[in-house]
């Protein structure tokens, strides 16, 4: 006799110490738990809540291999599974791709493969890798996933006495017996996941678990980084690498970008078409009159590759796709923090202090002027950074920030080589914008605009709202949170890039246009500056808090995720990036 798939009655339940609290049946308004998330919950509750409850996604090597293993089983059309009322006891067949749901069980599933043997239906779940050497033939998470599929088949009226797992690498099939214990474990996992997601609670990360290194959500979960705030040390080095994919910039007027198979095709009048694999693209940045076809937009949306739309002058206009998790949990916490004056002010104090300290570090490392002037500037910035940590009001912080900016930019010309300072075109007196009046300010403005776009994208992918900040005020067209996060990165990413291209002679005096009192880079110079910025993102740094090495590109992603963890309450404070 098949084990029961009904939650046990009160008389059947164990003692209070072992009490399993079952969620009520789902309604039409409730989300149903995918069978794969039953697997995830038993493997790691935090993984299941992040992926299903918070809508977080990430592609890993194992995930891609799993997709290929599934595709390998699809050799052609198969017959449809007959209705249970007409399925004969002597009927046998194989079929694929069946969707089942049950509000009573609170479950839903996409079944990979179904075997029908003499009227008995057997769900077959395909797994990449080899069969594990355990007595049950497979680990509990995988067996529970198959069990959930079997319960859905029973609920639909089919006879299902067992399930199966197919391990693609070792090419072995393992029978999953639907024991009473497995059914209960599956129902409890389903119920626990539904109740946890409904509560809005995010389970803590596993503690230095061997499960973490191969988890696709490791770069999102950040278990060791979060543990650092409890232990003061971190066990894993280095962090997961950033994706090898890079941004695609389109800025030639009249250029057209379309889709062909698994590539984007770039067409520019008078030039040969160029193709770029979609797997090699992390985001698309379009500046000015560059067109993107509808099929290309659809494919980018499916792959969750963001598209940033910029003006010809690289003012950020908006974005398509890449909006991060399909959940409002992190943003809800973000809006709550924005209304918490104490926490918001503490964040702002650390932010301004970090910005000043990073500017001071850039001056200290790149100074080419008189030593006496250097020490005066460094001492003033050190005092202002310290004052920022005790500022009581936003107005006071703004005053400190403004004073520090004046000291910093007054000293900025001392960072240029003599070859640059002797050129009148590169004379720099103060920071100006809208429009920038000289070549140095034009370079700074472009780098700041591109950096704002980079951070806006990273914040959105982390589940945050780039338009709602904690320090910068909200204005139309101004991504306040991106401008918050940019402060500590301005000196180390944008300003350092400008110094690099000017001091190395990559951009010269003939690379600028002057009109209406403003100054702008010519197209080739703009491409060169953006390329230098991207090279800077690929350079490695040591995280000042966690001690591991990572690229600046990966650092931005880590910092955006840490900010999401901070606003969600996972960590007590946000560790601003301040290189030693």
UniProtKB/Swiss-Prot annotation:
Q: Where is this region: CRISPR-associated exonuclease Cas4?
A: 1-223
Q: What job does the chain carry out?
A: CRISPR (clustered regularly interspaced short palindromic repeat), is an adaptive immune system that provides protection against mobile genetic elements (viruses, transposable elements and conjugative plasmids). CRISPR clusters contain spacers, sequences complementary to antecedent mobile elements, and target invading nucleic acids. CRISPR clusters are transcribed and processed into CRISPR RNA (crRNA). The Cas4 region acts as a ssDNA exonuclease, while the Cas1 region acts as a dsDNA endonuclease. Involved in the integration of spacer DNA into the CRISPR cassette.
State where [4Fe-4S] cluster binds: 44, 212, 215, 221
Cofactors named for this entry: [4Fe-4S] cluster; Mg(2+); Mn(2+)
PANTHER family attached to this UniProt entry: CRISPR-ASSOCIATED ENDONUCLEASE CAS1 1 (PTHR34353:SF2)
State the protein's name.
CRISPR-associated exonuclease Cas4/endonuclease Cas1 fusion
| Residues noted as binding Mn(2+) 1 in the record, renumbered to the chain | 112, 125
Q: Name one Pfam family in it.
A: Cas_Cas4
- Cite the record's note on assembly: Homodimer, forms a heterotetramer with a Cas2 homodimer.
GO process terms (BP): defense response to virus; maintenance of CRISPR repeat elements
Q: Which reaction does it catalyse?
A: exonucleolytic cleavage in the 5'- to 3'-direction to yield nucleoside 3'-phosphates
Q: How is the cofactor bound?
A: Binds 1 [4Fe-4S] cluster per subunit.
Task: Locate the region CRISPR-associated endonuclease Cas1.
Answer: 248-580
Enumerate the GO terms in the molecular function aspect.
4 iron, 4 sulfur cluster binding; DNA binding; endonuclease activity; exonuclease activity; metal ion binding
Protein family according to the UniProt entry: In the N-terminal section; belongs to the CRISPR-associated exonuclease Cas4 family.
Keyword entries, A-Z: 4Fe-4S, Antiviral defense, DNA-binding, Endonuclease, Exonuclease, Hydrolase, Iron, Iron-sulfur, Magnesium, Manganese, Metal-binding, Nuclease
């Amino acid at each position: 006799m098949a084990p029961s798939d009904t939650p046990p009655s009160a008389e059947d339940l164990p003692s209070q110490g072992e009490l399993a609290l079952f969620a009520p049946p789902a309604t039409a308004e409730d989300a149903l738990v995918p069978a794969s998330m039953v697997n995830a919950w038993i493997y790691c509750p935090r993984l299941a809540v992040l992926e299903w409850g918070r809508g977080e996604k990430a592609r890993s090597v194992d995930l891609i291999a799993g997709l290929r293993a599934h595709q390998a089983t699809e050799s052609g059309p198969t017959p449809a599974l007959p209705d249970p009322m007409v399925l004969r006891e002597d009927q046998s067949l194989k079929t694929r791709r069946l969707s089942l749901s049950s509000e009573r069980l609170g479950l839903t599933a996409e079944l990979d493969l179904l075997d029908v043997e003499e009227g008995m239906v057997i769900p077959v779940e395909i797994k990449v890798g080899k069969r594990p050497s355990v007595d049950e033939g497979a680990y509990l998470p995988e067996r529970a996933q198959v069990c959930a599929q079997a319960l859905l088949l029973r609920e639909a009226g089919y006879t299902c006495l067992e399930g199966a797992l197919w391990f693609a690498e070792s090419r072995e099939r393992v029978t999953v017996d639907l024991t009473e214990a497995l059914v209960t474990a599956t129902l409890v996992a389903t119920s626990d996941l539904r109740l946890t997601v409904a509560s809005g609670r995010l389970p803590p990360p596993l503690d230095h678990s061997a499960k973490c290194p191969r988890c696709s959500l490791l770069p999102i979960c950040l278990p060791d980084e979060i543990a650092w705030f409890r232990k003061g040390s971190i066990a894993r080095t280095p962090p997961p690498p950033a994706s090898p994919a890079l941004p695609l910039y389109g800025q030639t007027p009249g250029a057209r970008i379309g889709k062909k198979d698994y590539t984007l095709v770039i067409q520019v009048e008078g030039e040969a078409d160029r193709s770029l694999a979609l797997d090699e693209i992390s985001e698309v940045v379009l500046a000015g009159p560059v067109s993107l076809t509808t099929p290309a937009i659809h494919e980018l949306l499916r792959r969750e590759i963001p598209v940033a739309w910029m003006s010809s002058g690289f003012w950020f206009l908006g974005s398509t796709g890449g909006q991060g998790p399909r959940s409002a949990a992190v943003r809800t916490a973000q809006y709550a923090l924005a209304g918490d004056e104490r926490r918001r002010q503490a964040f702002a104090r650390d932010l301004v202090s970090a910005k000043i300290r990073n500017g001071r570090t850039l001056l200290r490392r790149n100074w080419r002027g008189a030593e006496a002037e250097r020490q005066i500037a460094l001492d003033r910035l050190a005092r202002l950074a310290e004052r920022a940590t005790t500022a009581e009001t936003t107005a006071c912080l703004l005053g400190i920030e403004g004073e520090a900016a004046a000291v910093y930019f007054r000293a900025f010309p001392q960072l240029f080589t003599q070859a640059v300072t002797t050129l009148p075109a590169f004379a720099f007196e103060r920071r100006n914008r809208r429009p920038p009046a000289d070549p140095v300010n034009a370079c700074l403005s472009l780098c700041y605009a591109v950096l704002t776009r980079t951070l806006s994208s990273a914040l959105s992918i982390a589940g945050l709202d780039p338009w709602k900040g904690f320090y910068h005020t909200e204005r139309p067209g101004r991504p306040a949170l991106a401008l918050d996060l940019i402060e500590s990165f301005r000196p180390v990413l944008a300003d350092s890039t400008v110094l690099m291209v000017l001091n190395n002679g990559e951009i010269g005096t003939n690379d600028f246009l002057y009109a209406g009192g403003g100054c702008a880079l010519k197209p080739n110079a703009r491409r060169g500056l953006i390329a230098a910025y991207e090279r800077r993102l690929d350079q490695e740094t040591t995280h000042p808090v966690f001690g591991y090495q990572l690229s600046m590109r990966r650092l931005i992603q880590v910092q955006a995720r840490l900010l999401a963890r901070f606003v969600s309450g996972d960590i007590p404070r946000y560790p601003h990036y301040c290189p030693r």
